[in-house]
Swiss-Prot record:
Similarity-based family: Belongs to the peptidase A1 family.
Any Pfam family matching the protein: Asp
Domain Peptidase A1 residues, every copy: 50-370
Organism ancestry: Eukaryota, Sar, Alveolata, Apicomplexa, Aconoidasida
Official protein name in the record: Plasmepsin VIII
Signal peptide: 1-21
InterPro entries: Aspartic_peptidase_A1, Aspartic_peptidase_AS, Pepsin-like_dom, PEPTIDASE_A1, Peptidase_aspartic_dom_sf
Known function: During the development in the mosquito vector, plays an essential role in sporozoite egress from the oocyst and sporozoite gliding motility, which is required for the invasion of salivary glands and subsequent transmission to the host.
The keyword Hydrolase appears for this protein: yes
Enzyme class: hydrolase
A molecular function (GO) term: aspartic-type endopeptidase activity
Active site residues per record: D68, D258
Effect of loss of the gene: In the mosquito vector, midgut infection and oocyst development are normal; however, sporozoites fail to egress from oocysts and their gliding motility is impaired resulting in a failure to invade the salivary glands. Processing of circumsporozoite protein CSP on the oocyst inner surface is normal. In the mouse host, sporozoite invasion of the liver is impaired but the growth and development of asexual blood stages are normal.
Amino acid sequence: MNKFFVFPLLLILNSIVLVKSLTENLRVSRYSKPGVSTIILKGGYINRQFIGEISIGNPPQSFKVLFDTGSTNLWIPSKNCYAKACYNKKKYDYNISKNYRISSSKNPVNIFFGTGKVQIAYATDDIHLGSIKVRNQEFGIANYMSDDPFSDMQFDGLFGLGISEDIKRKGLIYDNIPRNSSRKNVFSIYYPKSVDDNGAITFGGYDKKYIEPNSNIDWFVVSSRKYWTIKMTGIKINGLFLEVCSGNIEGYCDAVIDTGTSSIAGPQNDLILLTKLLNPVKSCQNKTLLKNFSFVFSDENGVEKEYELTSNDYIVNSFKVDPILKNPCNFAFMPINISSPNGYLYILGQVFLQKYYAIFEKDNMRIGLAKSI
């Protein structure tokens, strides 16, 4: 797992409130196009966390997973996990799978999530992503999961969709999906505006039905070979351009598109300034008084594109008021200073992705964004 993304996943685990159980069966969409497979995502947290179902083994065993573009490991609990956090999880039974193989080339590892920890051993087995079958895929079997934060989490395991720092690594599952003329090394994510609606993750392509009519797809070159990042040149509010990235060496910031983070995270001083400009009257009783703002990105042709968020997008009641921001509003902002080669990082999580459909192209190393339905 990328070290950098240990903390961002903690944002989604600790910054949202559990409000209901998953009452409907997770399922695969019947409307997937030939060559692609769409997995329906169901919500279990206020507007923030969406969980999908995959199967592992022969015969298949089903698991609920959180799809995370900020990490690179796929792991699920083992039948040998006796920790309290594993009690309410579906556990993988390797004894009943005909294709299970222990991975002798790797030792067990610890993966840390803030104060939490998962201990995994590596194995290979067949992974089923709806109609797509990935044979002999490497994944992690968790023999231990810490009580905090995993006891209260409704997913069984984590499905990493990040970019590996090791360019020779062949363990990433989307790299191993069988290719054909209609199935590409692409996956795309749609998050609904409300937890009551279904989201979707599509492997092998993208689905235009999740894109708002007349909305174009803008394409952005991935600016880091380690993470799903794009070039961010600034923030606009009321026509005022905040050059939050002007002090960086290259003149831009790296903005991570991260499904494993619930909020929008960024440099502390930048977010303090932004909240002051959004809400000068210090009142949140009427959200219409709050201003809109836009992230500005540089596309693959060097053209600046603006992606606007309104108060309906960035004010979320499930978020606590952040003491650092010193503002009474429930901003879905997380002040945090994380360094990168191009200065401090911004992390655009599910608050952003509920407004914009995201397409991740591995072969071309680019990300597509379009306004979602």
